Amino acid sequence: GRLGKLLVEEVKRRLPQAQIYALGTNSIATATMLKAGADFGATGENPVVRGVMDADAVLGPVGIVVAHSILGEVTPAMAEAVGGCRARKFLIPVNSCGVVVSGVKEQPLPNYVAQAVEQMMQELGEA
């Protein structure tokens, strides 16, 4: 919930015209992102699998591309859909997902979020 909230707030702050689809692995995460300003929200495997097909960018924890991560909430179908979608993926190295990204200096979560959104804007030509 917290990471999604921070991502939605930062994207809306930097790109107020952006349409944000909050695709949560659980209803609390989805509700938190909607409350933070996401335009649409849905929860579970099928919304994630279907939702990433049309996305320009996907932002989230690194665990969204690892099956069974985030306490088992990421299904193999979700991980495959996110990893294989055409969208550019901007992933936050959150070690609680069970994945350690070597060489990444530990930073406060808001710093990672700001960097991910900045990189997304540059790569998608929004900066």
PLM features: residue spans?
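A cross-family phosphate/adenosyl-ligand binding-site feature
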Residues: 2-60, 64-127
